[in-house]
């Protein structure tokens, strides 16, 4: 676990704008008309509509996406009763988590009131503002009364996350750990060390999942809770045992299958761990020091299935994989409550997710080759991008089925897409690419079949239904790797290009290539040798029509790939040059950037080809190009060197394509600021238009720009997309992720579809 110093923590919270959250306007406000609509007099209209029908508050205000994180500061993290104001940094932090994981807006509310009745009345009074209420850091037993009363008396979702968040995540972990251990929940003996809000809520949920009360022993600071003990709270009474033969943790733990600790550090010894049943499940959730350390538990017995609350060990029980998505599903159905059915739906969704193949982005975040379901991975990781869809959708369905939803979701695919877009996992353009590719999947050759990233991408592309993958590489190595990564190769062709069984194909390809390039110095023997190289072989598959598209680049430099592509595929006859483009999907919109990889120092003719290809490519993606050709000068302010080349290219393009919105040369700030450009240069062909296509003067500026934007923002980048080759040959780079390659595969498939349609005409 990363060591955090006091100085670093205080600096983090104080630097820049103090705190961690802010309110951001969601409507325009730059003109007087905007302000008149936002406030007086325009604001009166939605007020009157809400007066007539309070339900319309979900249509005209932020209520439907707004949660209150409310606390009185009586049980703050590991700090105890530090007061409402002192707990504000924690509540702001909770708001931050809601926003970054589920796109939910939060007001943190610190109520300086310990009396439960007065606290309840305060919360009820402000409840109309919110779509849901997350109670936080309120001590037991008051928290039980507060939550129960608010759930009864309000018509919006209310959840005390300290109780139910831990319960939901640990329940999902318990179901999966039991599956790994080969045990059934109704048969296991469970020992719970701790009797606070979290412990009792966890144990109640275990019972709801099938655990038997008579198989559960709960302990508090005095030992095993027995039914003959006087003055028990209602929650302790519920789990009090009639047994009189056990009093201590050491006695209770003998032969137990499950240990749940929500107490204090270092209370479970190695001897106690060893006294448990075979394949024991140990959830040591005290923070920051667990009841038994991960190292001690594993050293005491190798068959233990272990979870802690810490991120530096496997199977972390972390509430963040629950509460954002539970509220997301509740808000999206305008639910009146978060009920048991919704909580159980979340449990099963989280548990099921851990059994699915893990996205590459998760593996990369934890620097592992591949997480697979088992002793070291039975709870999903907080960074898993599927949580927003799987858990939110399960909760929303449960809300509808249990009758607490006021709004029904009818199109679940559309809802899933909206959730992905909400978190920036999917843009409209990406979705269109996939949908188009699915209509006519093509045969796509993946050059580096033995590379884990390429293999995962091919499998994912197949699962998405966008292509029929063909992997190049040693079939035995690929099959072994697929087994290690727990990937199915069903429906995926593997070609071992260097095997004797491919000799005839290599010879045929060599003859075709040597004949094609006979006047460029090629001979049959050299061509034969080249067919043992994956790029030559794969591109020849496309050239001969035995495949439709080709993806390469994880093992090969661009310069080498470009050389082979020119040799085998060639440039389209209407151009003398080819280039590449990257697409940037930002919050401001979609931008097309060229040339990002090929032409180092383009002259005027090369820039003209890049501009032509960019126009064609942007139109290929169903956008209308509005193109700025960039330089460090503006419209002839410098008449030498690079600006002059760009200037001449613009002149040519404007004459040849009078309908095209293109101008330059110009600096990038004028290209992207329409108001500034129109004020200073009102004569341009771009007047009043938002630029979406940027042609850079050289490779250095284009390449640096797209990588800078990719590194410093949340912009989705698709590319490189080749422009100008005769066939669909596309490149990746050595740092490409699985998602990058799948995106390029979708582009390659559409490229192949368009190519075939042209030839049919």
Where are each of the predicted segments found?
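N-terminal ligand-binding/catalytic initiation module
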Residues: 1-158, 353, 397-398, 431-455, ...
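Adenosine-phosphate binding glycine-rich loop
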Residues: 2, 161-162, 181-183, 284-392, ...
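Helix-enriched interaction subdomains in cytosolic or periplasmic regions
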Residues: 12-45, 390-423, 559-562, 593-596
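Glycine-rich adenosine-cofactor-binding loop
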Residues: 66-78, 83, 167-170, 181-207
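Anion-binding alpha/beta catalytic cores of soluble intermediary-metabolism enzymes, centered on
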Residues: 85, 137-184, 406-409, 415-761
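NAD(P)-binding Rossmann-fold cofactor-contacting core
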Residues: 193, 209-236
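Rossmann-like adenosine-cofactor binding region
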Residues: 237-304, 310-312
């Amino acid at each position: 676990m990363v060591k955090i110093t006091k100085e670093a923590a205080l600096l983090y919270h104080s630097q820049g704008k103090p705190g961690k959250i802010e309110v951001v306007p969601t409507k325009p406000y730059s003109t007087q008309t905007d302000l008149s609509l936002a406030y007086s007099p325009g604001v009166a209209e939605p007020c009157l509509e809400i007066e007539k029908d309070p339900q319309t508050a979900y249509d005209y205000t932020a209520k439907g996406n707004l949660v209150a994180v409310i606390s009185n500061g009586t049980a703050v993290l590991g700090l105890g009763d530090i007061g409402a104001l002192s707990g504000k940094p924690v509540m702001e932090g909770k708001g931050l988590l809601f926003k970054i994981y589920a796109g939910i807006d939060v007001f943190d509310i610190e109520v300086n009131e310990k009396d439960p009745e007065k606290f309840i009345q305060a919360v009820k009074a402000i409840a109309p503002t919110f779509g849901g209420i997350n109670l936080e850091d309120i001590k037991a037993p008051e928290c039980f009364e507060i939550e129960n009363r608010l759930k009864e008396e309000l018509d919006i979702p209310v959840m005390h996350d300290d109780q139910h968040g831990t319960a939901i995540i640990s329940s999902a972990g318990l179901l999966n750990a039991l599956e790994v251990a080969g045990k059934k929940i109704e048969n296991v003996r469970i020992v719970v060390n701790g009797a606070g809000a979290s412990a009792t809520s966890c144990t109640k949920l275990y019972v709801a999942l099938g655990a038997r009360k008579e198989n559960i022993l709960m302990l508090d600071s005095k030992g095993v809770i027995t039914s003959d003990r006087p003055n028990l709270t209602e929650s302790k009474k519920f789990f009090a045992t009639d047994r009189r033969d056990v009093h201590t943790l050491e006695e209770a733990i003998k032969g137990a299958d499950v240990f749940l600790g929500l107490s204090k550090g270092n209370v479970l010894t190695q001897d106690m761990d060893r006294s448990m049943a075979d394949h024991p499940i140990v959830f040591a959730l005290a923070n920051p020091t667990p009841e038994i350390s991960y190292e001690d538990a594993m050293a005491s017995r190798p068959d233990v299935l272990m979870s802690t609350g810490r991120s530096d060990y496997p199977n972390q029980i972390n509430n963040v994989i629950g509460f954002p998505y539970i509220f997301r599903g509740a808000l999206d159905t305008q639910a009146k409550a978060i009920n048991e059915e919704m909580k159980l739906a979340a449990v099963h969704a989280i548990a099921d997710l851990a059994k699915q193949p893990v996205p590459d982005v998760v593996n990369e975040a934890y620097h592992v080759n591949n997480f697979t379901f088992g002793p070291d991975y039975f709870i999903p990781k907080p960074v898993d991008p599927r949580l927003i869809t799987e858990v939110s959708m399960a909760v929303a369905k449960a809300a509808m089925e249990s009758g607490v939803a006021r709004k029904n979701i009818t199109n679940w695919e559309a809802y899933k897409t909206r959730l992905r877009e909400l978190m920036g996992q999917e843009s409209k353009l990406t979705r269109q690419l996939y949908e188009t590719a699915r209509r006519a999947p093509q045969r796509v050759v993946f050059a580096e079949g033995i590379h884990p990233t390429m293999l995962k991408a091919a499998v994912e592309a197949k699962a998405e239904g966008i292509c029929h993958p063909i992997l190049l590489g040693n079939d035995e190595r690929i099959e072994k790797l697929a087994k290690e990564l727990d990937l199915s190769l069903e429906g995926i062709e593997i070609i071992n290009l260097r095997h004797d069984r491919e000799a005839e194909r290599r010879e045929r390809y060599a003859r075709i290539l040597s004949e094609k390039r006979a006047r460029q110095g090629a001979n049959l023997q050299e061509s034969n040798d080249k067919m043992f190289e994956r790029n030559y072989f794969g591109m020849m598959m496309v050239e001969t029509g035995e495949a439709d598209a080709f993806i390469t680049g994880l093992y090969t430099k661009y310069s080498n790939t470009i050389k082979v592509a020119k040799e085998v595929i060639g440039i389209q006859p209407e151009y003398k040059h080819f280039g590449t483009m990257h697409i940037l999907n930002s919050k401001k919109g979609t931008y097309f950037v060229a040339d990002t990889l090929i032409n180092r120092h383009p002259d005027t003719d090369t820039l003209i080809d890049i501009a032509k290809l960019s126009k064609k490519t942007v139109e290929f993606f169903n956008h209308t190009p509005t193109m700025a050709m960039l330089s460090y000068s503006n419209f002839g302010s410098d008449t030498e060197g690079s600006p002059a080349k760009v200037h001449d290219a613009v002149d040519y393009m404007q004459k040849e394509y009078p309908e095209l919105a293109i101008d330059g040369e110009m600096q990038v700030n004028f290209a992207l600021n329409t108001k500034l450009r129109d004020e200073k240069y009102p004569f341009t062909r771009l007047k009043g238009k938002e630029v979406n296509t940027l042609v850079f003067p050289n490779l250095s500026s284009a390449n640096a720009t797209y990588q800078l934007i990719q590194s410093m923002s949340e912009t989705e980048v698709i590319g490189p997309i080749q422009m100008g080759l005769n066939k669909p040959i596309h490149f990746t780079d050595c740092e490409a992720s699985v998602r990058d390659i799948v995106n390029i595969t979708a582009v390659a498939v559409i490229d192949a579809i368009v190519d075939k349609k042209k030839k049919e005409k």
